Structures are given as structure tokens and as C-alpha cells.
Amino acid sequence: MKEITTTQQFEQEVLNSANPVFVDFWAEWCGPCKAVSPAVEELSGEYKDKVDFVKVNVDQNNELAQKYNIFSIPTLAIFKDGKVIAQSAGAASKESIRTYINKNIQTEASA
């Protein structure tokens, strides 16, 4: 899963992507973020070629966090055609995240 480190990279990888993009807004010090991370990593493999997955460290990318109103973490957002189409804050199970993705992009994982 790709780590976004600049606003320019976010534009390229997320806003200009042909695929829907799942964005994990997180921070190093955040316990719930660390709890969600393995599930997000596994799902990124299941959805490859259908959904792009990226991580944004809110401490290193404060401007992006402010722009997208990230007030609590983890926040899991889905972007499509350069716009946020779904956003959910808080830790969630792998199954909950899978349901969230399927509901918002109308696709099933190949796994």
C-alpha cells in the first residue's frame, strides 16, 4: 500500500486516478489506526486492479487532513473521480471495511 507524502502526490495518486481510491488517514501514535492497518493491507491485496489503496499520515500531511475535514483517526475515505464519495471515522473490522468498500464502489473482491 502506497504512502502519500505530499499534496502533489495525493493529486496524482488519488484525485487523478482512473480507479476508486481507498484512503486510510492515520497517525503513528494512534492505537486504533495500528489495529485497522493489517485489515486494510489485506484488503488492498484482495481489491488490486479494482481499487487503489493509499495511506496518509495526518501529522506529516496536515494540509490534506484539514482540506478533507479529518478530525478523528483512523478515517477511511473512498475517492472516485477526484471526489470523496464516502468517509468513515473509527476502527473497524476487516469485514466491516469490506462491506463499506463494496457498498460504496459496487464491486466484489476477487478473493
Model segments located where?
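A short beta-strand-turn-helix
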Residues: 3-20
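Conserved redox-active cysteine motifs that mediate thiol-disulfide chemistry
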Residues: 25-39
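Structural microenvironment flanking redox-active thiols in thiol-disulfide oxidoreductases
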Residues: 56-65
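Conserved helix-turn-beta segment immediately C-terminal to the redox Cys motif
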Residues: 18-20, 37-56
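Acidic phosphotransfer microenvironment of two-component signaling modules
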Residues: 8-11, 62-63, 95
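Non-catalytic, surface beta->alpha helical segment in thiol-disulfide oxidoreductase systems
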Residues: 72, 78-110
